[in-house]
Amino acid sequence: MEQHTIITIDGPAGVGKSTLAKKLGTILNLPYLDTGAMFRKLALQLGNKAETLPDSILQEQCKKVTFQLQGVGKNSLLMCNGESIGHEIRSETAGILAAQLGERTIIREYLKNIEQQIGNTMSIIAEGRDLGTEVFPKAQFKFFIDANPIIRAQRRFNQLKKEGIFQDYNDILHSINYRDKLDKNRTIAPLEPAKDAILIDSSIMDIDSILKIMLNYITIPHLSQ
């Protein structure tokens, strides 16, 4: 059976995981899997009442939502039910809904299964929160990116502004702190670095500097699709 290469990039919101995954994917000619987008899209598809649904009903609702991954690098495209995922998932509302639903074992196991199926069929760069610890514990290369919440909020504000989405900075900072608390204190797959992950603080580093560090650890001969 062919061994696919898995590179995981974990960390809280606003540390640059998506940008790093896209650029790294372009350099290494690998698709990148945005698992945060999967959580957000699933949360929006299920609606704001999903958190209170019984496990049996929630499980049936999840089965109606499927994901597919196409392309490589910056051209990687995550599809939901055969359609591309839009900017609607980048709202803070979607982020909070996703964090709340992340407390449900049914949700985490459903998406974990899809993510592992994708990783079994191709080499990927996967970014999220618990990939190195829960989803791909045997990944060949693991990174955990962190940064000061104030800096992360400013980055998020700038990112949303570029996308034409205007939100109050203080609301974004509050949302980040709230989500950090949920992510770090949940009983199921809490946000924490894998024991064998490379830890990088991106507070005072630009993307290119972080990429250089990551590429120093990634040995190209291991890469195979």
From Swiss-Prot:
The keyword Hydrolase does not apply. Keywords: ATP-binding, Cytoplasm, Kinase, Nucleotide-binding, Transferase. One of its GO terms (cellular component) is cytoplasm. It catalyses: CMP + ATP = CDP + ADP; dCMP + ATP = dCDP + ADP. ATP binds at G11, P12, A13, G14, V15, G16, K17, S18, T19. GO terms for biological process: pyrimidine nucleotide metabolic process. It is an enzyme of class 2 (transferase). It is found in: Cytoplasm. Transmembrane segments: none annotated. Its EC number is 2.7.4.25. It holds the Pfam family Cytidylate_kin. CDD domains: CMPK. Its main location: cytoplasm. One of its GO terms (molecular function) is dCMP kinase activity. Belongs to the cytidylate kinase family. Type 1 subfamily. This is Cytidylate kinase. It comes from Lawsonia intracellularis (strain PHE/MN1-00). The lineage of its organism: Bacteria, Pseudomonadati, Thermodesulfobacteriota, Desulfovibrionia, Desulfovibrionales.
